[in-house]
Amino acid sequence: MPSLSGSDELIFFVNGKKVVVKKPDPEVTLLFYLRRELHLTGTKFACGEGGCGACTVMVSRYSASSKQIRHYPVTACLVPICSLHGAAVTTVEGVGSIRTRVHPVQERLAKCHGTQCGFCSPGMVMSIYTLLRNHPDPTPEQVTEALGGNLCRCTGYRPIVESGKTFCANPTVCQVKRPGRCCLEQEEEEAGSVHTREKMCTKLYDKDEFQPLDPSQEPIFPPELIRMAEDPNKRRLTFQGERTTWLAPATLPDLLELRAEFPQAPLIMGNTTVGPDIKFKGEFHPVFVSPLELPELCVLNSEGDGVTVGSGHSLAQLSDALQSIVSQQPSERTETCRALLNHLRTLAGVQIRSMATLGGHVATRATVSDLNPILAAGKTTIHLVSKEGERQIPLDGAFLEGSPRAGLRPGEIVLSVFIPYSSQWQFVSGLRQAQRQENAMAIVNAGMSVRLEDGSSTIRDLQVFYGGIGPTVLSASRTCGQLVGRQWDDQMLGEACRGILDELRLPPGAKGGQVEFRHTLMLSLLFKFYLRVQRALSKLDPQKFPDIPEEYTSALEEFPIGTPQGTQIFRCVDPHQPPQDPVGHPVMHQAGLKHATGEAAFVDDLPLVSQELFLAVVTSTRAHAKIISIDTGEALALPGVVAVITAEDVPGENNHQGEIFYAQREVVCVGQIVCTVAADTYAHAREAAQKVKVEYEDIEPRIITIEQALEHSSFLSPERKIEQGNVEQAFKHVDQVIEGEVHVEGQEHFYMETQTILAVPRAEDKEMVLHLGTQFPTHVQEFVATALNVPRNRIACHMRRAGGAFGGKVTKPALLGAVAAVAAKKTGRPIRFVLERGDDMLITAGRHPLLGRYKVGFMKSGLIKAVDLEFYINGGCTPDESQLVIEYVVLKSENAYYIPNFRCRGRACKTNLPSNTAFRGFGFPQATVVVEAYMTAVASHCDLLPEEVREMNMYKRPSQTAYRQRFDPEPLRRCWKDCLEHSSFHARKRAAEDFNRQSRWKKRGLAMIPMKYTIGVPVAYYHQAAALVHIYLDGSVLLTHGGCELGQGLHTKMMQVASRELGIPTSYIHLSETSTVTVPNAVFTAGSMGTDINGKAVQNACQTLMARLQPVIRRNPKGKWEEWIKKAFEESISLSATGYFRGFQTNMDWDKERGDAFPYYVYGAACAEVDVDCLSGAHKLLRADIFMDAAFSINPAVDIGQIEGAFVQGMGLYTTEELKYSPKGKLRSQGTNDYKIPTVTEIPEEFHVTLVHSRNPVAIYSSKGLGEAGMFLGSSVISAIWDAVAAARKERKGAESVPETLAVRSPATPEWIRMACVDQFTDMIPRDDPSTFTPWSICVS
């Protein structure tokens, strides 16, 4: 650290108010400062690496040179506060507030039902708001692009995009690029034709209620900042922190002076590389140099032979500049510019593109850089400058590979980059493939350029660069050199492929894995470039250069990023229903406006408590080992550290129901909590946690996979089995028997709000108060009481809302609550425990990986006579919910099909992985994808469509399940029929077959899936519920119940129930929180039964109150509610009532293999259509149609939101979401960089949802629980992918490399799709013997 006399003041504005920081710390981010110092908690912490957009804010800067103000979005978690000198920051609180005025962006997001849990909502608001500040009349494409850097786990994005499109002059952009009318033109017709005897509605909100957007009313940029920017006497700024120094030079000479003095100090512009490296790789820099806003770094000159771009330009600014240049220059001059533009659209999200700079992108030379390969292929040069002078170097292979002779010298900086214009016979392309279309680092990317001799196809110069193949971007220079002088033809392509494989081959166990896939991508991307040049030559001279075959043209078409459209159809409310009765109406989420304004408080938004400490975890780095020692000395010596908590500090039991709070003597998985550190700040706690030294001694066996568990007979529970008919006998009397197995990998919950707990000890009576987001407060209370060795009545758990849960907050908060409570007990001080995203993923695990083995006997007609299923799930190291999950797997495994001879067996395997737990669908999404796999296999063997086999074997009449529960499948048949008809399945299937005949390298697939989904659990006492309703003397009502608001709209529906039962508007009703103090012994909110059971309890309480009020009402029937309440009080009538619902009487006798296991079923059907790129493995979801049996929907907006959100989450399970583990059991997917949930670009271009009416006398108001059912319908997407891949493989049928049966698995990632689409390029890839190397990652299912 330099020796400096003092620190300058940091000046910036937040929401129009001046902020002056006397001693700013360079290590403090804007997110931390907003939340902890300014108490602006609307900006959320969710990932900490700029990958989710929850912390999006708008930064505004004035440029003295251009005299313009620039507004741009940033992720506050990556922005050092020291970089904000002279800037204005706008947070969601500065946009609008319920207390003052709600902004149109916030209002429309809420009223369009674009919020569920609400944790991502402030970031969504800020992304759309920033777009409108720059483009008050945006296009739908701009709305979609603006949201590309924001993640939502609840809604499925459709209503969020729709809210943004309400600001567009023309919000409708038809996605139909094939025969057929626009979906929106058919909307009214569809609504009229579905159940013609019922009136159907298509509008979930009234756009006439929206307040108009008036750009003139937005806050002005602070004049003081303009004066600061134009000050001619600027000087260097120095900010001195606790450990680091920030130096902000005012001039270029000053920058070069600092660079010479501190050559190792990183230059901070956007902090998108250095910031994550500091946080996740433990890097430390005593000095930072930040040359923001230096005019010499912001030059832009497009005159002459190319474009000179200053290194300080953000990637967003670079994109704007290139768009302008491309529009002005002839196309043959802008080959490189257009290639860069194409990549910039999908590189990261808008926030990161607005922060990251061209200079930083070039200088870091990252292997996954999307721009450097293109810049190198385009013969770009770099202008370097230092105190010693200036020089230019080529951005070539030597530079990118890190050659000392070709890189930056000490003291140098990148001043600018020169991108030469291309010539007529030069062709440049950028190509990439990532796990998803946008906001994902490339698996492999490439920059390719060829210069041909004028008028010929002879190669004069060839440049091929690949990222993602080695530690740096690599050049195939040897191969390219050998091809100079050759003709651009098929023979050259074959030699190029062989040469590149030889020159750039990855070792078999290379970091990142996917070796064969990456090798294949190298050739596939080269082939795409080859075709593109062939096509361009034919356009230059059709007589001389033949065009590529018509069926090959699809290889040149990138999947577009469309704007989703769709319809939502539901039953209208009976016109005779009283107007004040909200049941059946699409009512906005009761906290929607609070979500959108950032005023909805989550646990970490609660104000700091006096003497509060922060907790950080130390987790095991071994999968199975003995703990030899824990050395806490160095950690305890650090400033601010109060205590290190271990198993020895647990006053009560350290092991409850098999769950271990703090590891004791041994660890049983990577990620198990060994100890925690309590300190005065989170930064101090985390730093100290990294200093704790744990010595281990490995224990064998180390069991990671299901196969290993089977080998060691390692199980968590006994086998569960159901059987009907005579399976073995039936196999002897069928035409054909097939066998197979399907691996279904796990899934991370990725709730936006990580596990968060505030534990506050009370001085009296050993009481402890916990605030947390959970689905099961009673369970937390039980675990904390056990750990502290106190009665449960001393533990109070308060739960207002959770930022998403999906099953991940049923059991895990109990474990973590006990950990936090023990720390609070030891220190005697409040403990705030907020898991980092990576720690959350590591510790809490997720959906169970599953191995399914099937044996199916069927007739030539496709009729299935016998099925034998074996399921194994990877339960992890402790019981958790694995027993219940495997029971669900077995009970739900028949799905919608009647198989007369059916047997299913299941076991939960014990492994040395973190314990997997409940997840939306509870085993059904894993098990039934195996069922659909064998349905597809049977269809293939019978030369039938899978849909024909499904329909043939579907339940058709009132029946009983394999476990002898009776049901009527009429709604199932109706959903199937309606979906078949209204999705135009057969017409589209024929069109897809025509498309596939005409397209070699892209294939289209369709699939339609039926569903019979169970609601509730087979244990009766888990269906009980209670409520507490108070009526106050002013007529207002306080409602409390035992259910937890997780974003599913439970509180909204409970208010609708209370409103109907009490006959008052919902405005009279307030619902504050769920608490063990008000409603004791409440069961978990899960299994889609929250509304069913809590609604009955609320109804019971309200009916009790209304019965008490009846004498008063009869005497004054025309009186007002307030008058009745006042009179009741005067007559000493109790205005408080508890409500209780005993529950559904379900049971399951596993010894007899029979029972009425579930209260009722939800039925549905979904049709999905996808395009698959056979060369890259990418896929595009074109359309999805969902028909869901909703019975009578209490709130169609909430129910449709649940269906859409579950469908997209299911789609993620089956496509983009891939958990990778090392052979030693370490989770490699720990954050947004490594784990990819769907973004706005993955959802269907056409998304249609119809609620099908039926009757359900079991549930309140004849409704049905719809929180989970849509999850499995996402499997229609993977089934459509299988269909498209089968079409690709059909063209290679008979080839030795193409087995007759496609071995399917989930997820269908780009890797699986590409390698399944076997072709001449996959045939060229060398296969390494698995026994000769250790793989980077393994399949644990």
UniProtKB/Swiss-Prot annotation:
InterPro entries: 2Fe-2S-bd (IPR002888), 2Fe-2S-bd_dom_sf (IPR036884), 2Fe-2S_ferredoxin-like_sf (IPR036010), 2Fe-2S_ferredoxin-type (IPR001041), 2Fe2S_fd_BS (IPR006058), Ald_Oxase/Xan_DH_a/b (IPR000674), Ald_Oxase/Xan_DH_a/b_sf (IPR036856), Ald_Oxase/xanthine_DH-like (IPR016208). [2Fe-2S] cluster 1 binds at residues 47, 52, 55, 77. SUPFAM superfamilies: 2Fe-2S ferredoxin-like (SSF54292), CO dehydrogenase flavoprotein C-terminal domain-like (SSF55447), CO dehydrogenase ISP C-domain like (SSF47741), CO dehydrogenase molybdoprotein N-domain-like (SSF54665), FAD-binding/transporter-associated domain-like (SSF56176), Molybdenum cofactor-binding domain (SSF56003). One of its GO terms (molecular function) is FAD binding. The keyword Transmembrane helix does not apply. GO terms for cellular component: cytosol. Its EC number is 1.2.3.1, 1.17.3.-. FAD binds at residues 267-274, 348, 357, 361, 370, 414. One of its GO terms (biological process) is xenobiotic metabolic process. Mo-molybdopterin binds at residues 116, 154, 805-806, 1046, 1087-1090, 1202, 1266. Binds 2 [2Fe-2S] clusters per subunit. Binds 1 FAD per subunit. Coiled coil: none annotated. It catalyses: an aldehyde + O2 + H2O = a carboxylate + H2O2 + H(+); retinal + O2 + H2O = retinoate + H2O2 + H(+). Its cofactor is [2Fe-2S] cluster; FAD; Mo-molybdopterin. It comes from the Eukaryota. Residues 8-95 form the 2Fe-2S ferredoxin-type domain. [2Fe-2S] cluster 2 binds at residues 117, 120, 152, 154. Detected in liver, testis, kidney, brain, Harderian gland and olfactory mucosa. The active site is at 1268 (proton acceptor). Residues 239-424 form the FAD-binding PCMH-type domain. Homodimer. AOX genes evolved from a xanthine oxidoreductase ancestral precursor via a series of gene duplication and suppression/deletion events. Different animal species contain a different complement of AOX genes encoding an equivalent number of AOX isoenzymes. In mammals, the two extremes are represented by certain rodents such as mice and rats, which are endowed with 4 AOX genes, and by humans, whose genome is characterized by a single active gene. Belongs to the xanthine dehydrogenase family. Aldehyde oxidase able to catalyze the oxidation of retinaldehyde into retinoate. Acts as a negative modulator of the epidermal trophism. May be able to oxidize a wide variety of aldehydes into their corresponding carboxylates and to hydroxylate azaheterocycles. NCBIfam families: mam_aldehyde_ox. This is Aldehyde oxidase 4. It comes from Cavia porcellus (Guinea pig).
